[in-house]
C-alpha cells in the first residue's frame, strides 16, 4: 500500500515536471502564505506529498484550463488569482466549521473552478461577453445577472455543466452552479456551496469594496450562520488568508 502510494506520487511528480508552467504554478501555490510552511518547497515531489493528490489534481486541471483561455479577454487576466483566493478561503471556512479534510479539499476544488464558465463565455461568445461586461459597468449590475438577462443562463450554469461532463462529484457541481444563488439549491445545512458562496463574496469585498457580489443573507440566516459569517470575514482580512 505504502509502495503503491509512493509510486503514484512519483508518477504525478514526473508528469508535472514535464510542464514548466505547471511546475511553477504548483510551487507558487504550495509556498503561498495560505499553507503557512516554515521552509520553502522547491521540489515538485515534496509539493505533491504536502498538498495531496486531490488538491494537485484540482490545481492542474484549472491551471491548464486558465492558461489556454484566460488571455482571450482582458477582463479575465486576474481570474486565476481570484479563483485561487476563493478556493483557499472556502477550504478554510470548511475547516473552521470542524468538517473533514476531504470536504475541505472538495471546497478548494469548487472554489478554484467556480468561475470556469466565464472562460467558456469569453471564448465561445466573445462579442456577446464584451457586451455583458459593458452592461455590467454601465448599470452597476452583477455580471451573472447581466448574463442571465442577455443569454438566459449565466457562467455558473455553464461551469456546472462543464464540471458534470468532466465527472466531478455532484456536491462540487452544485457548489459551482448555485454559488451566486444558494437559496435555489434547496440545501438546508452547511455545505461546499455555503463555503464557496461566502468565500466569493468576501474575496470580492476585499478587492472591490464598492462593487461586490451580493451575499444571500437570508440563506446565511436560514442556516443559523450569522455569527460564523463574522468569524469568516475576520479571518479573510488576515494577511495569511490567501
PLM regions with names:
Residues 219-242:
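Terminal helices and disordered tails flanking the catalytic cores of nucleotide-processing hydrolases
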Residues 1-116, 120-131, 136-137, 143-213:
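Conserved alpha-helical "signature site"
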Amino acid at each position: 500500500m505504502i509502495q503503491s502510494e509512493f509510486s503514484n506520487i512519483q508518477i504525478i511528480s514526473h508528469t508535472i515536471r514535464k510542464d514548466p508552467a505547471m511546475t511553477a504554478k504548483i510551487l507558487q501555490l504550495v509556498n503561498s502564505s495560505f499553507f503557512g510552511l516554515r521552509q520553502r518547497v522547491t521540489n515538485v515531489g515534496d509539493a505533491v506529498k504536502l498538498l495531496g493528490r486531490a488538491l494537485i489534481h484540482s490545481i492542474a486541471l484549472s491551471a491548464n484550463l486558465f492558461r489556454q483561455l484566460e488571455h482571450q479577454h482582458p477582463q479575465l487576466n486576474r481570474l486565476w488569482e481570484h479563483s485561487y483566493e476563493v478556493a483557499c478561503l472556502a477550504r478554510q471556512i470548511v475547516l473552521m466549521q470542524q468538517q473533514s479534510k476531504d470536504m475541505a479539499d472538495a471546497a478548494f476544488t469548487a472554489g478554484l473552478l467556480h468561475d470556469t464558465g466565464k472562460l467558456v463565455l469569453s471564448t465561445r461568445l466573445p462579442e456577446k461577453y464584451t457586451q455583458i461586461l459593458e452592461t455590467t459597468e454601465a448599470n452597476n449590475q452583477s455580471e451573472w445577472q447581466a448574463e442571465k438577462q442577455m443569454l438566459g443562463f449565466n457562467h455558473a450554469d455553464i461551469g456546472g455543466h462543464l464540471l458534470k461532463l468532466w465527472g466531478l462529484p455532484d456536491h462540487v457541481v452544485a457548489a459551482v452552479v448555485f454559488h451566486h444563488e444558494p437559496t435555489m439549491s434547496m440545501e438546508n445545512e452547511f455545505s461546499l456551496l455555503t463555503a464557496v458562496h461566502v468565500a466569493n463574496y468576501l474575496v470580492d469585498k476585499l478587492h472591490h469594496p464598492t462593487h461586490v457580489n451580493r451575499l444571500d443573507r437570508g440563506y446565511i440566516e436560514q442556516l443559523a450562520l450569522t455569527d460564523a459569517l463574522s468569524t469568516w470575514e475576520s479571518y479573510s482580512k488576515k494577511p495569511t488568508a490567501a
